[in-house]
């Protein structure tokens, strides 16, 4: 599986599918939800990935987010009765808390009306409680009647659920917008227990969620189930991801190479997609029986952009999952091939687990020093040659090579889309000469599409 962040590999590798018995799948991620593009259903994200994506703080925001994700499971699962019961429980708890407040009746009335304008159910809404909370001469008409209606009396009834346990997140399909409603319910439930400041504490997380809901580059993550959006199962998605098709009771390999073209998206999207796909692949191979019988290689192009030694400034820190794969992946048949121009910026944990190295020309002193620390058995004479290595030449060393060796890489045919600009030929353009370049063409008009996980 190739994480192609520069859109280079399809031109070179797609022809391998022509009569060679090597299936090649080329999928394009451009951030849109257009037909034929890569899609990643948002419910495939784990709870910890949601926490990172929304940058939820551990002490206040994470508990609210976990409760909201659990509620989102009810939004999706068709269990309308259970969801309505929890909503009634939360509203009844909130209204009861307001009744016990020391403020005056007019203030309590206004707070209840405002609350039920935002959140209400068929059983608890402004019309159903109006008879209890109307103000007569500065006093609420029938507060005890409202208490009996909400909490029940000697004859039973009421909406409070004793010993209620909030549902846990189960990665079931749900509308992306439903998480926003679930966050509001979770905050409301916390407010009902006296935490008046929780909404302010969670305001940044809510803002980040609304940003994800609106940003065009995250359209690939948002699935519209009500609008007829395709609802892939995780098994179907993973089988396509690993190039498998089912033939009766057996899995058959269809594609040997899966190229995920991420040239059209920014680093934060690359980091999110790479992290989630790597984690899903790792989990699948850990659960495979027998283990270690289906090796998978992840080729991480420009790895310093999302497997960095320092925490990411974006939401998802992909280094975590790749560090675990680097340490444990060999037990399950998952391996990393890390390609980077800046080895000094890569995760030290990932680099420490690499057993073979192919090093092209490197001139940066920090990178040279880093290589020296990684490979103490290489002589200074060999390292001094690295800044002056010709194009297509590299130094190879590691467990697969008896002695560090410099070699020339054979010409690729066909070449990847990574040619250097011919500055000498293209710098000067006579007036009126055609530029021979298309400007402003959207990625969806340029790229081809192969199998798509949508």
Where are these regions (language model features)?
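Glycine-rich phosphate-binding loop of nucleotide-binding enzymes
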Residues: 1-31, 40, 396, 428-429, ...
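P-loop NTPase motor domains
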Residues: 2, 7-17, 39-324
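Structured core elements
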Residues: 2, 28, 208, 258-261, ...
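Conserved nucleotide-binding/hydrolysis micro-motifs of P-loop NTPases
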Residues: 6-10, 33, 264-266, 304-305, ...
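Short, conserved active-site loop motifs that form the nucleotide-linked donor/cofactor pocket
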Residues: 21-24, 257, 334
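Conserved AAA+ ATPase "SRH/arginine-finger" region at the nucleotide-binding site
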Residues: 26-32, 40, 44, 357-366
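Conserved ATP-driven motor cores of ASCE-family P-loop NTPases powering translocation/secretion/packaging/pilus
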Residues: 56, 317-410
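Conserved P-loop NTPase motor module
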Residues: 121-124, 139, 143, 152, ...
């Amino acid at each position: 599986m190739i994480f192609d962040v520069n859109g280079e590999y399809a031109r070179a590798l797609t022809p391998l599918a022509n009569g060679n018995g090597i299936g090649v799948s080329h999928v394009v991620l451009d951030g849109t939800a257009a037909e034929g593009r890569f899609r990643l259903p948002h419910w495939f994200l784990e709870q910890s990935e949601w926490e990172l994506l929304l940058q939820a703080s551990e002490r206040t925001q994470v508990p609210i987010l976990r409760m909201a994700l659990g509620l989102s499971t009810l939004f999706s699962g068709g269990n309308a009765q259970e969801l309505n019961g929890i909503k009634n429980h939360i509203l009844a708890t909130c209204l009861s808390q307001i009744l016990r407040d020391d403020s005056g009746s007019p203030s309590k009335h206004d707070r209840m009306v405002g609350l039920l304008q935002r959140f209400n159910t068929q059983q608890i809404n402004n019309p159903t409680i109006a008879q209890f909370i109307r103000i007569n001469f500065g006093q609420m008409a029938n507060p005890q009647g409202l208490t009996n209606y909400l909490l029940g009396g000697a004859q039973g009834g009421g909406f409070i659920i004793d010993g209620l346990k909030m549902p846990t997140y189960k990665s079931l399909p749900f509308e992306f917008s439903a998480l926003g409603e679930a966050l509001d319910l979770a905050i409301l439930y916390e407010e009902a227990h006296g935490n008046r400041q929780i909404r302010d504490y969670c305001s940044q997380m809510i803002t980040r969620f609304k940003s994800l809901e609106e940003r065009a580059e995250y359209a690939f993550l948002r699935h519209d189930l009500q609008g007829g959006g395709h609802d892939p199962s995780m098994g179907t998605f993973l089988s396509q991801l690993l190039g498998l098709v089912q033939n009766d009771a057996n899995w058959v390999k269809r594609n040997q190479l899966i190229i995920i073209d991420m040239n059209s998206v920014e680093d934060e999207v690359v980091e999110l997609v790479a992290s989630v796909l790597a984690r899903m692949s790792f989990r699948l191979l850990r659960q495979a029986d027998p283990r270690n019988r289906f090796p998978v290689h992840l080729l991480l192009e420009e790895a310093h952009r999302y497997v960095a030694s320092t925490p990411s400034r974006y939401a998802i820190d992909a280094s975590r999952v790749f560090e675990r794969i680097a340490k444990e992946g060999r037990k399950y048949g998952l391996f990393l091939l890390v390609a980077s121009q800046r080895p000094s910026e890569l995760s030290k944990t990932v680099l420490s687990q690499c057993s073979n190295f192919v090093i092209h020309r490197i001139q940066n002193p920090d990178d040279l020093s880093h290589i020296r620390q990684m490979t103490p058995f290489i002589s200074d004479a060999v390292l001094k040659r690295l800044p002056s290595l010709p194009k297509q030449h590299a130094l190879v060393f590691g467990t697969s090579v008896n002695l560090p060796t410099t070699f020339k890489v054979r010409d690729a045919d066909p070449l990847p889309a990574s040619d250097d600009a011919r500055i000498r030929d293209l710098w000067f353009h006579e007036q009126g000469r055609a530029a021979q370049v298309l400007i402003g063409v959207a990625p969806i008009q340029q790229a081809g599409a192969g199998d798509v996980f949508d």
